[in-house]
UniProtKB/Swiss-Prot annotation:
Gene3D superfamilies: DnaJ domain, Heat shock protein DnaJ, cysteine-rich domain, Urease metallochaperone UreE, N-terminal domain
Listed cofactors: Zn(2+)
Species the sequence originates in: Thermoplasma volcanium (strain ATCC 51530 / DSM 4299 / JCM 9571 / NBRC 15438 / GSS1)
Annotated localization: Cytoplasm
Domain of life: Archaea
Keyword Lyase: no
Protein family according to the UniProt entry: Belongs to the DnaJ family.
Lineage summary: Archaea, Methanobacteriati, Thermoplasmatota, Thermoplasmata, Thermoplasmatales
Keywords: Chaperone, Cytoplasm, DNA replication, Metal-binding, Repeat, Stress response, Zinc, Zinc-finger
Keyword Chaperone appears in the UniProt entry: yes
Mapped zinc finger ranges (CR-type): 139-220
Subunit structure: Homodimer.
UniProt GO MF annotations: ATP binding; heat shock protein binding; unfolded protein binding; zinc ion binding
Name this protein carries in UniProt: Chaperone protein DnaJ
């Protein structure tokens, strides 16, 4: 049967976020399990119920789904709430401060939200790799050398000789250490990761001699990374299983590409822009001139009357698309060179040209 979260908190279905929070705080203080030592089981169940209602109604998206369907999926395809689903421990901590006057948890919460899991440790590694635009154009292979922590091959990451582990004598397998303050039902508990086992709950019966019980050894890696054709700046290449190792797990290495600027070419997405100089005669009369980018040669057709700054496109001669289908275009921007020194004959011809210009609206009509 679906739960009526509004009824549980005692609020109207149109209640504001502030009304919902206020109702939860009042009920949480009323039903805190440490205040009901003679009926703790009922108090714990009631406290969990109002916390479930608050988790749903205080979240706009969860509340919207609940209002439409009458239930909320807390993960795993089911609607059963547990404390792993609760995301408002800071609100409960504020309530604890009001009740007990200190920033402490409770026996009731000693197992929720406090244990640090090694699963949350980021074991991935990241490194930048500089490549040229030409290398990005053709694709290439690059060697990378680096140092990392790898799983000890002798103990397989357990840190124990022959892989034999025993229950931690300090935390008795919980991975936690608790400090209790106060007496009776005003007990206040802080929970920390066990210093002996590091939160694992088990320790080596005898330390592995190769890694001295750490489960990892330092190794120097020398690997080859394949750079794909058409690689882009900031592209991340994942090398599986070459990250840091800890607690029997290993992360990945991410190689982040940095493409250096080319002195002749500018990349615009998958197009390439090339500045090409031509002389006055080629611009005026038109011409066919050879051009080259990297190892690729093309014939550039200059139309008659080409102006400075005109862009001529060679379709499909740009960067290869990263997905492997087709390429961008090569854009050739024309720069018309004006000679700084002229022979007498050249001067005479230019004067004749200007004489023609005086009788026409433009040089070329």
């Amino acid at each position: 049967m679906a739960k009526d979260y509004y009824k549980i908190l005692g609020v109207d279905r149109n209640a504001s976020e502030e009304d919902i929070k206020k109702a939860f705080r009042e009920l949480a203080k009323k039903w805190h399990p440490d205040l009901h030592p003679d009926n703790k089981a009922e108090a714990e169940e009631k406290f969990k119920e109002i916390s479930e209602a608050y988790e749903v109604l205080s979240d706009p998206e969860k509340r919207r789904i609940y209002d439409q369907t009458g239930s909320v999926d807390f993960g795993g395809g089911g609607s059963n709430f547990n404390w792993d689903n609760f995301t408002h421990f800071s609100d409960i901590n504020d309530i604890f401060n009001e009740i007990f006057g200190g920033n402490f948890g409770s026996d009731f919460f000693s197992g929720f939200g406090n244990r640090q899991s090694t699963r949350n440790i980021d074991l991935d590694m990241y490194t930048n790799l500089d490549i040229s635009l030409e290398e990005a154009y053709y694709g290439t292979e690059k060697r990378i050398k680096f140092r990392r922590n790898a799983i000890c091959p002798d103990c397989k990451g357990t840190g124990a000789k022959n892989g034999k582990l025993i229950t931690c004598p300090t935390c008795h397998g919980t991975g936690q250490q608790r400090v209790v303050r106060g007496q009776g039902f005003f007990r206040m508990v802080t929970v920390t990761t066990c210093n002996t086992c590091g939160g694992k709950g088990r320790i080596p019966e005898e330390k592995c001699p190769r890694c001295n019980g750490t489960g990892t050894i330092v190794v120097d890696e020398d690997i080859t990374v394949k750079i794909p054709r058409g690689a882009t700046d900031n592209l991340r290449l994942r090398v599986s299983g070459k990250g840091q190792s800890y607690d029997g797990r290993t992360g990945d290495l991410y190689v982040i590409l940095r493409i250096k600027q080319d002195k002749n070419l500018q990349r615009i997405n998958d197009d390439l822009l090339l500045d090409q100089k031509i002389n006055f005669g080629q611009a005026a009369l038109g011409a066919d001139i050879p051009i080259q980018i990297f190892n690729e040669k093309y014939n550039l057709k200059i139309p008659e009357g080409t102006q400075p700054g005109d862009v001529i496109k060679i379709k499909g001669a740009g960067m290869p698309h990263l997905n492997g289908h087709g390429s961008g275009d090569l854009l050739v921007r024309i720069n018309v060179e004006v000679p700084k020194r002229l022979t007498a004959k050249q001067r005479e011809l230019i004067r004749e040209l200007f004489d023609i210009k005086e009788n026409h609206k433009s040089w070329f009509h």
